[in-house]
């Protein structure tokens, strides 16, 4: 069984055509996940305009104990699903490489553009969603010094001189 988590109907249709060999289920919100029915599924997540990280959605996915998770994202987030095997791929992956990845064959999957820790991605997502510093500190339960440390490291990784340049960053749509 394949669970396709996306808000993009064109993406889902393409995945359904590629994965025609199996049972393909379209998931748009966390209420549609059935922990018993979808147990041990193969999960494919599209994060374009659908940032499911750091939400109950990801907790639900972890409970499914999926066989493998493929995430379409320019971000490689270290240990985002604990011990669940995760592969990050860009949306520009060749169909032949994607099919090889699904079948468990070796393929040269391009590396993600940006590699972040879970906490860095969480801070970045909060900043991209225009949360105030105080709200971020309260939500993430971190100190101001830790926040500025993460913010500085994120700016270095993304090559930003000022944090307001994030609004024009090429990957901003993967954070909201």
From Swiss-Prot:
Triggers of expression: By acidic conditions. Could be induced by EvgA via the induction of YdeO.
GO BP terms: regulation of DNA-templated transcription
Keyword Metal-binding among UniProt keywords: no
Pfam family, one: GerE
Domain HTH luxR-type residue range list: 109-174
Any one GO molecular-function label of the UniProt entry: DNA binding
Keywords assigned: DNA-binding, Transcription, Transcription regulation
UniProt-listed PROSITE patterns: HTH_LUXR_2
Superkingdom field: Bacteria
Residue range(s) of DNA binding per entry: 133-152
Biological role: May act as a transcriptional regulator of dctA.
Descriptive protein name: HTH-type transcriptional regulator DctR
Organism: Escherichia coli O6:H1 (strain CFT073 / ATCC 700928 / UPEC)
Lineage: Bacteria, Pseudomonadati, Pseudomonadota, Gammaproteobacteria, Enterobacterales
Gene that specifies this protein: dctR
């Amino acid at each position: 069984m394949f669970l396709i988590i996306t808000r993009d109907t064109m993406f889902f249709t393409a995945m359904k055509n590629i994965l025609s060999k199996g049972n393909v289920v379209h998931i748009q919100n966390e209420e549609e996940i059935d922990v018993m029915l979808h147990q041990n599924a193969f999960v494919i997540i599209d994060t374009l305009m659908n940032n499911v990280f750091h939400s109950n959605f990801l907790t639900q996915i972890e409970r499914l104990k999926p066989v493998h998770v493929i995430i379409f994202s320019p971000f490689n987030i270290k240990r985002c699903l604990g011990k669940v095997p995760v592969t990050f791929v860009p949306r520009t992956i060749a169909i032949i490489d994607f099919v090889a990845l699904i079948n468990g064959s070796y393929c040269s999957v391009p590396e993600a553009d940006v590699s972040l820790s879970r906490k860095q991605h969480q801070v970045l997502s909060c900043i991209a969603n225009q949360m105030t510093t105080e709200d971020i500190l309260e939500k993430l339960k971190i100190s101001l010094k830790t926040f500025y440390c993460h913010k500085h490291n994120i700016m270095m990784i993304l090559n930003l001189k000022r944090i307001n340049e994030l609004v024009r960053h090429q990957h901003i749509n993967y954070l909201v």
